[in-house]
Amino acid sequence: MLFHPIYDEDLAQGSYLIGCQATGEAIAVDARRDADTFIRAAEHHGLRITAVTETHIHADYQSGSRELAERTGATLYLSDEGDADWKYGFEGVKLYHGSEIKVGNIRLTAVHTPGHTPEHLSFLVTDGATTENPGFFLTGDFVFVGDVGRPDLLDEAAGFVDTRFDGAKRLFASLRDHFLTLPDYVQVWPGHGAGSACGKALGAVPSTTVGYERVTSWWAPLVAAGDEESFVTSLLEGQPDAPLYFARMKRTNKAGPALLGERPALRRFEPSELQGRVNDDLILLDTRDAERHRADHVPGALFVPEGKKFATYGSFAIDPDADERPIVVLASSEAQAEWMRDRLSWTGIDNVIGFVTSLEGLTAGPVPTVAPAALDSVAEAQLLDVRNANEHRAGHLPGAMQLDVSRVAYRSEQVPADRPVVVHCQAGGRAAVAAAVLRAKGWDDVRELEGSFDAWVAAGNEPERADDAPEPAAAGA
């Protein structure tokens, strides 16, 4: 048996390619839209993908299961568990609790593990050539390293009301009946790692075991003791802000993501062709680092720095449901522009049409900033903290309103437009993304706090802190 994890740090997301080397067949589980990655991995190992499945209707990225099945001719398997609200809107072989997928000598057994979502399946993997006992458990967003999947996303991002409580109770039962009953040696391979918003305390190692979670996780003693009430309270308390693009992902992944197929070549624009069009009939994505962006900002351009969180920050800055204008990215080459287009498609942003390699000649200027020492001189300023709610509670500038960077583009009406707005995060990275969004949406006076919260504290200022806040987190972006 070949077991090949395919992990992406941007989305903190894990996919899996599992193959039977005796027959040359393979199955992909929880694939992203970059189908070529999975096809190349299979070919590298002398395998062909004959089956594709996923653990649940994802909220944080656009599923690539349908795309990969279409590209390879593989059979697509989908959960048919859960209530009528969460049935897939496209065709696939239906899976239920106990259903089996066979790939050569490999057997995947579906285990219905509701809680994170009603239709959620996990997969026990057995290498039938050597044993009849499962050795791997693909848990999707059911169990992570050190944590479990949050049950509140249908409320937070999909418009449902109070499903979190029932979801938490279902998760308790799934852990009791389907996880803790497994042998300690079973390896657990989850759908996400540290950095994902699908849980609140995900570990940074790629996998764990049933036995390790039984001994070390916060939840196992509560489940073993039958203490559902304490489990529900602990699980729901302190969950991070759910990015609002999750609602769009849920909706499109349920209905059926659009098939990308063969994508057209990107057009190379000259800077002069963009003059007067930025934030008019097209979106310009400034992908430089924050320092260069602040030194030479094109009015109306959005800021999404090229790097390991490109797809994530892109989904924060752009809502394709509300803005269908074509996107031009700033890139050093056509190859880099194609990489950016592919990454943005992972969160359903499919309207990148071209790229520009320079901003020379475009109207540009420095981003307005204010030093911590000069903050009081900005009359009637609204301080905007774009860190998450837990960071804000742990310590914030007096009078600052909190709106997570992932929500600014979707809830900008909550930010006053009749006075100066001073944006900050922990160290400045997220603030630059959020400030550019507000400027593009028409806010006249948006400034960034130089060095953000870290610099303000370093200048000797005392933050306010919620009475029940945990200890402040370490400095970060």
What are these language model-derived features?
Residues 23-24, 36, 40, 44, 50-59, 107, 117-239, 424, ...:
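Metallo-beta-lactamase
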Residues 50-53, 75-81, 329-330, 355:
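Short internal beta-strands
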Residues 18, 30, 56, 68, ...:
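Divalent metal-coordination and catalytic microenvironments
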Residues 88-89, 150-152, 164-165, 212-258, ...:
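Rhodanese-like catalytic fold shared by cysteine-dependent sulfurtransferases
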Residues 1-48, 69, 123-140, 145-146:
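Conserved beta-strand hairpin/beta-sheet module of binuclear metal-dependent hydrolase folds
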Residues 31-32, 57, 81-82, 117, ...:
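Active-site metal-binding loops of divalent metal-dependent hydrolases
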